[in-house]
């Protein structure tokens, strides 16, 4: 089959490769010594994300080291809440802390209209990265999906059992929908501006999709994602959109059918047999090596990489992880995975 300069972009458009395109979630991060050096130049994590010279450098580091086919913008899914007017902080040992929304009256202090303008440093980061990337590398913009971002605002923190947001889904669906609508509106403009700045594909992270009852999954994951995708298309955004409903399980085929995403990210628990049986052969999939196995390395890592390559041979497949690269991951193990893929 004909090749393309931008292999990842071609894969998202349905092209099949003997050697699939590859990148890794959280490829720019604490497993890289150069990242730690760059991170030390900022006063805190938000400052790091909002400083284009630093965020662009972090985005480019794994491209220089590994030659990944995709460069994903270095940012955080909670920037949108910060820009909308909810105070966000990242405390060591606590994870993210967010100014909590307790009810409809709190929405008065949230401004989706102003959020996109406040995120202008992110668009500058995108432009800087685009100008510096090799011609064959696809630039991926991203945001959190409405459910996951709203959950942080409702819970007020990242370390949570999610019960408050789940109770809203069951008992206060109209209030939850109001929050998610505001998030979707702000996120659509945010992502559209990323594309205008140079992003060639987009990814929607629904990190808290796991474990939801099927009816609630439809209401808080599928419906808001469908709305967000529609808002982007209405704005004339035509780039591929990768949906990543982590932990969707048996709801994944319905998510693919109903949301309008171009491709789907698979989590660590996904079964290749299930994916190949339930998703159309021409639908692009991305994933899904276990990041903990990437830490361990050895013969089992080699075997799993080959197993995933074989399982998705003949369909559009972007090799990735089922979750992000962890800080303790040896660089040599990442290099080994890339060697196996590139010699497939």
Curated annotation (Swiss-Prot):
It is found in: Cytoplasm. SUPFAM superfamilies: UROD/MetE-like. GO terms for biological process: protoporphyrinogen IX biosynthetic process from glutamate. Its EC number is 4.1.1.37. This is Uroporphyrinogen decarboxylase. GO terms for cellular component: cytosol. Pathway: Porphyrin-containing compound metabolism; protoporphyrin-IX biosynthesis; coproporphyrinogen-III from 5-aminolevulinate: step 4/4. The record marks 76 as: Transition state stabilizer. It comes from Hyphomonas neptunium (strain ATCC 15444). Substrate binds at residues 26-30, 76, 152, 207, 323. Homodimer. It is an enzyme of class 4 (lyase). Keywords: Cytoplasm, Decarboxylase, Lyase, Porphyrin biosynthesis. Belongs to the uroporphyrinogen decarboxylase family. It catalyses: uroporphyrinogen III + 4 H(+) = coproporphyrinogen III + 4 CO2. The keyword Cytoplasm applies. The keyword Lyase applies. GO terms for molecular function: uroporphyrinogen decarboxylase activity. Transmembrane segments: none annotated. InterPro entries: UROD/MetE-like_sf, Uroporphyrinogen_deCO2ase_HemE, Uroporphyrinogen_deCOase. Catalyzes the decarboxylation of four acetate groups of uroporphyrinogen-III to yield coproporphyrinogen-III. CDD domains: URO-D.
